[in-house]
Design a protein with these regions (language model features):
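Extracellular, beta-strand-rich glycan-interacting domains
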Residues: 192-203, 303-327, 340-349
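Extracellular glycan-recognition modules
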Residues: 162-233, 319-323
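Flexible glycan-contacting loops in extracellular carbohydrate-active proteins
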Residues: 279-308, 334-338
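Extracellular glycan-interaction surfaces
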Residues: 159-170, 200-204, 223-282, 372-383
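Bacterial Sec-dependent N-terminal signal peptides
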Residues: 1-5, 11-52, 149-160, 383
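Contiguous beta-strand segments of beta-sheet-rich domains
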Residues: 68-81, 115-141
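Extracellular/lumenal carbohydrate-interaction signature centered on repeated Trp-anchored short motifs
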Residues: 51, 181-195, 247-254, 302-308, ...
């Protein structure tokens, strides 16, 4: 019996000893430091860069409270941006280092679970580039805790939503249109392509209201309405195909983002970033060589609507759905090597639509096709 009592006592003392050790070490061994935003499924969020800049409130927290202050370096990881773009179909660039504060730390006081680090970024000219802040936790300089490797990075995308002047156009004469110089052939040979723009039509009263006619050795003709009404649908005729049609559900006086994508076998129509139609079409005979572009091109007999347009982009490859969705509300970098042409259509006056790529593929609005310019047009995300 004495042996049993002695064994029991020794076991109890051992348990007490180990429990005491666990309590002493718990805050260090069972704890971690991480970014609250990185704890969710999304690894990025969008913040708006205004004239006054932007304040980003970054929550840095512990899994468990500590009995001592915890201090951690805060910094940036631009080397992670390329992999992020690859995974998400984005074209972001890391914000220049001189736009960010350097050598900063954040402290979670003893007994607290978190702290807010406020990062202020002054407004700056983005020139068509969408920048991202690759926020990152650095070394823990005070406190017995380690940072979470999986949740120590987060991407804050700096958005400057489009706010532009747009031309409202309607053909005055039978052959009046907007077009690039027919005497300057582009000679852009492509295997796949994407044409995208913001478009608003005042009516769908007649057929064959052609918003685009690509000048090439193979047909690419984009219009609202064919022979059979009602005509509130988009049709794309490509490479001798009879046409790819959307549903008849387009509304007058509503802005739509339209993207036409040929991926080498299928012609796909996207509206507001979502696929709404698509089918197999013949391959371009002799390959596709694009030499020019026309807009609002079917003449006054057919084109009776007032058509507003903005941000016309022609690419030499098939853009993914993610790429379309992630870039349609913002400017794109005019230096992107995959652009055949980029026409923001935001001059606010005149008859020349400049090609922002610098390739010189400007377009001219003939005669009186521009009825007016509308200022301060924005394209915000639809909830």
């Amino acid at each position: 019996m004495k042996y049993i009592y002695l064994s029991t006592l020794m076991f109890a003392l051992s348990a007490l000893l180990f429990t005491g050790c666990d309590n002493a070490d718990y805050k260090a061994n069972g704890n971690s430091l991480y970014l609250s935003d990185a704890a969710g499924t999304s690894k990025s969020s969008t913040v708006t860069l205004t004239e006054n800049g932007v304040d980003i409130n970054v929550v840095i927290r512990l899994a468990n409270k500590m009995a001592e202050d915890v201090e951690v370096e805060v910094g940036y990881a631009p080397e992670l941006v390329a992999a992020f773009n690859e995974s998400n179909g984005t074209e972001y660039e890391a914000i220049p280092a001189d736009k960010l504060p350097q050598g900063m730390t954040a402290t979670i006081p003893a007994g607290e679970i978190s702290t807010i680090f406020q990062l202020h970024i002054d407004n700056f000219a983005t020139n068509g580039v969408t920048y991202v802040v690759p926020f990152s936790l650095g070394n823990v300089v005070k406190g017995s805790v380690e940072k979470s490797s999986a949740m120590s990075h987060f991407f804050y995308v700096l958005s400057k939503p489009l706010n532009v002047s747009v031309p409202v156009m309607q053909p005055y004469g039978y052959n009046e249109k907007v077009e690039s110089d027919p005497d300057k052939k582009w000679g852009a040979a492509v295997d796949t392509y994407t044409l995208e723009a913001w478009v608003r039509m005042s009516n769908f009263n007649v057929n064959n209201q052609a918003i685009f006619n690509v000048q090439a050795n193979n047909e690419l003709y984009i219009r609202f309405g064919d022979a059979n009404g009602p005509y509130n649908y988009l049709q794309v005729k490509a490479h001798g195909d009879g046409g790819t049609d959307t549903d008849r559900d387009w509304n007058p006086n509503q802005w739509y983002h339209v993207a036409i994508v040929y991926n080498g076998s299928e012609l796909i129509i996207y509206r507001d970033g979502k696929r709404i139609a698509g089918k197999q079409v013949p391959a371009p005979k002799g390959g596709m060589v694009i030499d020019g572009l026309q807009m609002v091109s079917s003449g006054s007999m057919y084109f009776t609507a007032e058509c507003a347009m903005s941000q016309v982009r022609l690419w030499n490859y098939a853009r993914s759905e993610a790429e379309i969705q992630n870039n349609m509300y913002y400017e794109v970098n005019p230096k992107n090597a995959n652009l055949i042409g980029l026409w923001p259509l935001d001059e606010g006056k005149g008859k020349i639509f400049k090609d922002a790529t610098g390739k010189g593929r400007d377009m001219e609005a003939q005669r009186d096709i521009i009825l007016r310019w509308e200022p301060n047009v924005t394209f915000g995300k639809k909830e």
